[in-house]
């Protein structure tokens, strides 16, 4: 938000009324100063990470040491087709991730509001070469723009997968005992022949690069057509398309990923988020911003103090 060129492009292409309708606000772009704690968390709690591909529209924080050999600075123009730039739509950026130069065949995707706050192993993300994930259904009320976009994904999934065949082939992965009560819709919907929305912990997500390539081969027309959406629109396809495809293909190892992750919407759970960071209650947390957070400056200061409590030392990624 502090970059004049980015701000000028944002103002040039944006329509405030349309953006508000589609869930676009400055809360999605503002810098609340926590990024350094993301790098500290990776270095302290996941030292096994070999490479970080840091994606921006061309900027770099002043404090970031871009010469760090573990860091690959990636601009949108390095992997997104030129005709779709500039883009301010995260779901467009995410669908092209597999084109990032040097990206490993197995990778973990983090949004900028996902943080590692406790020690975590590679096996948390991959086992037997496959992503760890939870395959459980969720009722989709379609009350929000986001849920409507998820339904766009499911239409593609149902065109390419037969639910009964998937269940028969990968039964143990859909009815893993550790899922507990979260799997209740899996049992209830056994007779139903179509897929519905999958529940997602909304946190760090492991992927196979081949999944993206396969989805693009199957649904490239739809993905290309909606890549013109510089801002979020109800016609979008979200990254859940790739995750759901990966699960339906059986390319995952079952794990109740809710056991060590938590999303905190700061609008209603800022105190819980601060306490969870201080106590390192989870391995992974999502700090979900909102433009209407009351006492915003106070909340951000308390979150910063919590992060600094567990991650006080500079990482090698800081100058």
Locate the predicted segments by residue.
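ER/Golgi luminal nucleotide-sugar-dependent glycosyltransferases, focusing on the catalytic module
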Residues: 1-108, 115-319
């Amino acid at each position: 938000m502090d970059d004049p060129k980015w701000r000028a492009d944002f103002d040039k292409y944006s329509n405030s009324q349309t953006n508000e309708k589609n869930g676009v606000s400055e809360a999605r772009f503002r810098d609340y100063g926590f990024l350094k704690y993301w790098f500290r968390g990776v270095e302290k709690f996941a030292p096994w990470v070999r490479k970080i591909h840091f994606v921006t529209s061309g900027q770099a924080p002043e404090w970031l040491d871009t010469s760090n050999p573990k860091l690959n600075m990636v601009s949108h123009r390095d992997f997104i087709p030129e005709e779709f730039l500039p883009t301010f739509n995260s779901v467009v950026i995410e669908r092209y991730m597999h084109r990032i130069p040097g990206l490993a065949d197995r990778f973990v995707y983090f949004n900028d509001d996902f943080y590692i706050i406790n020690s975590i192993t590679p096996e948390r993300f991959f086992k037997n070469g496959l992503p760890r994930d939870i395959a459980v259904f969720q009722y989709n009320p379609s009350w929000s723009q986001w849920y409507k976009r998820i339904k766009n994904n499911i239409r593609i999934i149902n065109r390419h997968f037969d639910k009964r065949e998937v269940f028969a082939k990968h039964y143990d992965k859909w009815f893993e005992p550790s899922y507990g009560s979260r799997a209740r819709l899996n049992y209830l919907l056994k007779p139903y022949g179509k897929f519905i929305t999958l529940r997602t912990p909304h946190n760090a997500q492991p992927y196979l690069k081949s999944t993206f390539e396969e989805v693009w081969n199957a649904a490239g027309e739809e993905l290309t057509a909606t890549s013109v959406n510089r801002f979020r629109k109800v016609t979008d396809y979200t990254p859940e398309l790739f995750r759901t495809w990966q699960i339906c293909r059986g390319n995952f190892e079952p794990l109740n990923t809710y056991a060590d992750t938590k999303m905190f919407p700061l609008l209603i759970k800022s105190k819980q988020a601060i306490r969870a960071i201080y106590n390192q209650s989870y391995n992974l947390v999502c700090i979900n911003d909102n433009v209407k957070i009351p006492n915003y400056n106070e909340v951000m200061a308390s979150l910063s103090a919590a992060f600094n409590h567990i991650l006080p030392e500079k990482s090698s990624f800081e100058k």
